[in-house]
Amino acid sequence: MGFLCRRRSSAAPAESFSLLCEEDSESVFGSDDDGVEETATMAPELGKMMSLGFSASHHLGDGGGGGEELVGSFMEKEVEQMVETARGEYLTKLSNGGIELSCRIAAIDWICKVQAYYSFGPLCAYLAVNYLDRFLSSVEFSVTNDMPWMQQLLIVACLSLAAKMEETAAPGTLDLQVCNPEYVFDAETIHRMEIIVLTTLKWRMQAVTPFTYIGHFLDKINEGNRITSELISRCTEIILSTMKATVFLRFRPSEIATAVALSVVADGGRVLDFGGVLESSKLPVDKDNVGRCHQAMQEMALVMQNSTASPSDSLCYDMTNPVLDCHILRRRECVSLQSGPRDELEMGWAPFAITVSEKEESERRCDDGWRRGGEAAQYCEQADEQRRSTDGRAGVRLEEQAGGE
């Protein structure tokens, strides 16, 4: 199986393979044409929802049984993801505040920076973190200081997959590595890591997230009042702010979405009896868990208010004088970037431009990068061989069973 790692051009053949998701929301979620007329008559704020990363399927509709049936199917699906995320000692390691926690926070910071740099939708960033957590909880992936490049390779692969799932024009794997990453990998190495992530997650990449429910739940809790773009933006902000806090890994996406909707409606000036609102809305969620999730959000908001740093500081970065860590790239390729054709710079190489004063340091990093690049390639080759061996054993067992029958 190959990957299309170069930019699409008008001359590219239509049959070229890529991981770009060509399905629309209806084919993914099993919707039919009946939803077209409903979508066309929705409030203009739906356009705002879609621009923020909500798809039409995320607005599950109001009235009738279709929306409730979709909610039920999504809640069944999210249970499987909860099992994956809570498996093993992953949450325990994060709760202990060790290197796993610091690496996860650094990963989310970088993902958010790239999201802001390319103006990705919020769902793209959320999916990248979702893939990261599910992968780390599903395999024995040792986070150590000896191989920091391994962590960066995994993060890039998760974000690349999320961009291919959600963005209509996902950048190439090399272009994706902006905002001063410590290591930069070549396309082949990243694609190998993508395959490892895909197989580990059993190709279940259309994850259920709080964004899946928020439009429907907000409409229920807001009691039919107009859903404004301010409410939608506030929901998005709170959902993204929950990514770093590991306490929210213990809650289902539906519970997070309910707590977010309650918080946003209450912040709008309405006095809510949370228990009464949940009872009247008839949302199929655990009310006790929603209460605990809402309390965690209030505590998180209090910490952010008392912090001297601005909440937007995590998204601030300096791209005026970036330094390219040329790991995995050839020295001649690194040097050529500073004098490459103008069209290449306009197509995405500008963030990697190297100044003359940085040339010597970049060459030193290239030499060190080849050594680390060999380690990354060796890891991917070993993982590929292990996967092929596992698939082969499974095939032999199936043949034996078929022969016995």
Curated annotation (Swiss-Prot):
Keywords: Cell cycle, Cell division, Cyclin
InterPro entries for the chain: Cyclin, Cyclin-like_dom, Cyclin-like_sf, Cyclin_C-dom, Cyclin_N, Cyclins_cyclin-box
Organism superkingdom: Eukaryota
Swiss-Prot/TrEMBL GO biological process terms: cell division; G1/S transition of mitotic cell cycle
Keyword set includes Signal: no
Pfam families per the UniProt record, alphabetical: Cyclin_C, Cyclin_N
GO MF annotations in UniProt: cyclin-dependent protein serine/threonine kinase regulator activity
GO cellular component: cyclin-dependent protein kinase holoenzyme complex; cytoplasm; nucleus
Keyword Glycosyltransferase (UniProt): no
PANTHER family xref list: CYCLINS
Similarity-based family: Belongs to the cyclin family. Cyclin D subfamily.
Protein name: Putative cyclin-D2-3
